[in-house]
């Protein structure tokens, strides 16, 4: 399959803290003369969810692979079955890595690649006569604002259930009032098929306690983990529910001092940090699951609900991370050593989102020195070599013309003047060596 010729977007306006721009829906209806197999190639600058005839077919969550689009643009492929007659492709875009002002401490708000989310897609199939057809991203696609009013990879989401558009991605939906998509410029980065393991939900947790406080209801899930909360509520029209996440308690409430950027914009950031917001439409049971963010937390403070709504069934934690296969483990007669192994593994998986990050609640950055030090024990426990290989490509691409590396990869350009140096550069030696030790890699093909 050839890479799509065109990227499209809803508009050039992108989301900021001061001016919220909703995540866009895009759709394209087309006719097929018989049931047929088809191949889809799709990428996005930002995150995407892909739908065919109303069914979400996305591989995992937070797709595609997170990268600097000036260096690498990753795409995914799908095999699908088209029905005879009308078919509908739907794409929902989130800001992802392309527009994450919540990372302003590392200059992501001023990144050269910062832009509105956009996508490129090509679906190919063969008709009854044997003629090949391609449905491609272009200006014939229709677009409309979704109920996701604000999404930031690091901070959270604001979703308004009153603005949902039932059937937007299904057959027979009238999109005549939607505007046409516009063409976007091609990113500079190399286009590559993603071979790293996808991120997906691996477990569900229910609260071990629910406690009433002056600020709302405190949900304790018993363990520090990473993912999102699925909210299930019978709410009233216009009821606004806020979920504030935290790893520890301070004065009986989730503490944010370890994740709150106390520099410029500190008051603004406190309003958004580690928080998801849902407004109810009030027509029965409503379910909301954040799509384009994740959090590191144990506790969730829920405000805006009644005592009757504050049940154990209100929230379910969806634990997420890269789907790395189990490789090894450790146990012995010493329970302290066993607990250390358990804690280490939990830390590893909750920080592995395509590549090893430093923390799932604040930075979500790929610090190279951290990864170099942790790679030995991670590879003893988990089959992470495919993800490591993909990340090594990004590391090589991040080098400047003098060969210097930033301290974090991917980066906006930050990290060449602080937080780097020999200890961080060692990832180019340490990581390939640990891959050789673990799975006998004798070469790494990295252009």
Question: Model segments located where?
Answer:
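Extracellular/oxidizing-compartment recognition motifs
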Residues: 1-362, 369-370, 386-389, 401-416
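Short alpha-helical patches at coil-to-helix transitions and adjacent helical residues
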Residues: 364, 368-371, 421-429
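Well-ordered alpha-helical scaffold segments within catalytic/enzyme domains
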Residues: 373-384, 428-441
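Active-site diphosphate/adenylate-binding microenvironment
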Residues: 377-401
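The substrate-binding groove and active-site-proximal loops of carbohydrate-active enzymes
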Residues: 415-418, 437-438
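Conserved small/polar residues in nucleotide/adenosyl-binding loops
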Residues: 442-447
